[in-house]
Amino acid sequence: MGPQTGKRLLVMAGGTGGHVFPALAVARRLASEGWQIRWLGTADRMEARLVPQHGFDIDFIDIQGVRGNGLLRKLAAPFKVLRSVMQARKVIREFKPDVVLGMGGFASGPGGVAAKLCGIPLVLHEQNAIPGMTNKLLSRIATRVLCAFEGAFGSLGTTVGNPIREELVALGAKPRESRTEALKVLVVGGSLGAKVFNDLMPSVTARIAQLQPVTVWHQTGKNNLSTVQAEYQLQGQDGGVKIAEFIDDMEAAYRWADVVLCRAGALTVSELAAVGLPSILVPYPHAVDDHQTMNARVLVDAGAAFLVPQPIATTELLADKLQLLAGDRDELTRMGERARAAAVLDATERVAEVCRELAK
């Protein structure tokens, strides 16, 4: 379908990078074709900072999650949601979008209901293998339901993959250099860090280093750097370790790595597949409906990753997995190839195309 200059898209995505970054990929694609993009989010979550940084205007509504909270808050929730729906409807009436795209986060619920009330086509995209509560509810009124992983919505959803940045898709298409030197382990714990990685990786690194060379790039999360750094020093491993609270350039980190130790958020799993990297996945055990374990199964079942449930994660187990990979570089390469084979590389275009179809 050709360019649709002047068409308007309202994007609802927020709370975590797993919602915001896939939405940004779609927004950038349509903006490059002349679409006007506007965002609906909440003022106290990461979209308030990220979205304007990428050049898009954002409107805020007042909404908070209600799942798992106290009784009093649940009783007040319907009134708060009604107010949020009215706020979202005001934004929709002013912006007059041709399509509303909901990709998760607190604003998606009221925004999706408001889109239905205003008669605007609503497209949902679920990034996880198990749908969140908001998308489960909105799927009943959505015009189109899209999902990253097959079966997330049963027969109701169309599987399209997770939109990711074009730079990562391009990175995965490039041949990797021969893996002959020290094993390069990228440890990614997310913006707040993963305590299990921060606690175990210094001793894991020391254990591996007794048998073979290893280098580590460890992302600790906010306020954890000095503690983790001290532990690596205590283990005598600070020389071969790069430690950072955040990694701003994930493309560079993925390019550097031989293997990734990380959680199993939907975006992370999709990025690992796209760049063709083997991984050891330790799903966050308190994720709603244990959806990270289901996300991980995509790569594990493809033979591209090891699954280590957090309750059994130990220094010995993680070190054994990494030593296994360090000692068999051919298998490391094969796992990377299997990861790439499991990737859906045109997800951004698939979601954008649905928006184009509904905006005719």
UniProtKB/Swiss-Prot annotation:
Pathway: Cell wall biogenesis; peptidoglycan biosynthesis. Its main location: membrane. It catalyses: di-trans,octa-cis-undecaprenyl diphospho-N-acetyl-alpha-D-muramoyl-L-alanyl-D-glutamyl-meso-2,6-diaminopimeloyl-D-alanyl-D-alanine + UDP-N-acetyl-alpha-D-glucosamine = di-trans,octa-cis-undecaprenyl diphospho-[N-acetyl-alpha-D-glucosaminyl-(1->4)]-N-acetyl-alpha-D-muramoyl-L-alanyl-D-glutamyl-meso-2,6-diaminopimeloyl-D-alanyl-D-alanine + UDP + H(+). InterPro entries: GlcNAc_MurG, Glyco_trans_28_C, GlycoTrans_28_N. It comes from Shewanella amazonensis (strain ATCC BAA-1098 / SB2B). GO terms for biological process: carbohydrate metabolic process; cell division; cell wall organization; lipid glycosylation; peptidoglycan biosynthetic process; regulation of cell shape. GO terms for cellular component: plasma membrane. Its EC number is 2.4.1.227. It is a peripheral membrane protein. This is UDP-N-acetylglucosamine--N-acetylmuramyl-(pentapeptide) pyrophosphoryl-undecaprenol N-acetylglucosamine transferase. Coiled coil: none annotated. HAMAP family: MurG (MF_00033). It comes from the Bacteria. UDP-N-acetyl-alpha-D-glucosamine binds at residues 16-18, 128, 165, 191, 247, 266-271, 292. It is found in: Cell inner membrane. Cell wall formation. Catalyzes the transfer of a GlcNAc subunit on undecaprenyl-pyrophosphoryl-MurNAc-pentapeptide (lipid intermediate I) to form undecaprenyl-pyrophosphoryl-MurNAc-(pentapeptide)GlcNAc (lipid intermediate II). Signal peptide: none annotated.
